[in-house]
Amino acid sequence: LQSSFAHNEEHMGRLGVVIIGLNGAVASTLVAGVALMKKGLVPRRAMLTEPDDAVNAEKLTDLLQFASLEDLVFGGWDLNDESLYEASLKHGVFRADELQEVKAELEAVRPWPAVFSREYAQNLQGRHVVATDGGHRGQIEAIKRDLTTFKEKHGLRRVVLVNLASTEKWMERTAVHETLEGFEKGIESNDPGVSPTMRYMYAANSLGVPHANFAPSLANVPALRIQAENNGVPYCGMDGKTGQTLVKTAMASMLRLRRLMVDGWYSVNFLGNNDGLVLDDPASNQTKIRSKASVLDSVVGHKVENHQVHIHYYKPRGDAKEAWDNIDISGFCGQPMQMKINFLC
């Protein structure tokens, strides 16, 4: 797929990565980690596009002509206007002495005002936000200006957008989501069905910016798919699934291969960061739980009648998320067995 922002050519220099939720735990860790890896201060590990320090490993970046870490340029939006250095210190994933080594690089990156409404995330406060007096259309135009300015400022030929924002409340698909014409009418009428996430994706599609939705918030609706396909814009994603659901899909696949029946699966998550605070709101919690719960039946190949997923905000955990799983299974001749997994991530 080709667009004015993303071309299928050999090597096009630096790649702009714009992030919704730039100062959040995941995004700030990503940017700080890349800065540290560029200086050789931490190992290049646990990435699909890097060789894990193996001398003879083939790099996917070379094979598929992906951008290297050295080519990445970061920008994005956040509800907090502090620098990435301040955000990274606050989240505490990397040690203060490590962050000191890349302080200048991180202090140079400050987020742009974000599109936000408490209607979609009750437990968040928006201090650094795009004005709402222009309605949905005005906010979309502000997003487009930010993307264009970022691209021009850094002399970039290509930009991608990644949604790492906190989870929005659960939304059902309605008529406004079904056609592009209806969606655009919803923009003009400030329809509440056009969420902040959807406004970002619409703006990205308008400029030909490929985008990935790393959050479970509803974005992959027919209207936006039509717009992306009309403009030749690649898109992907519906929740990153890097914690408990990562373990769940791996274990469920193994159980299916060994023909073990899953009788029940009880999952609990504890997290104490801003994402946990957002998920303490029942409306946002429902979005995440539905995303987590939806994966199991399709992987094990049968309906798991006793499948529970719970998410709790527990402030002492901070960014060190913890997941507990209790799995009840039936083995040979129906003999009961049980597995317990505790994943700190």
What is each of the regions a protein language model found here?
Residues L1-A215, A219-N230, A250-M251, Q338-C345:
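Metallocofactor- and cofactor-centric catalytic cores in central/energy metabolism, strongly enriched
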Residues V18, L22-A25, A87, V233, ...:
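Active-site-lining helix/loop region of Rossmann-like oxidoreductase modules
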Residues L48-D53, L106, D191-G193, T242-Q244, ...:
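Short C-terminal domain-edge/linker segments immediately following a structured domain
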Residues H211-F214, Y235-D239, D263:
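Short catalytic-loop micro-motif centered on adjacent basic/acidic residues
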Residues S217-L218, G240-T242:
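Short, acidic/turn-prone active-site loops that include or flank metal/cofactor-
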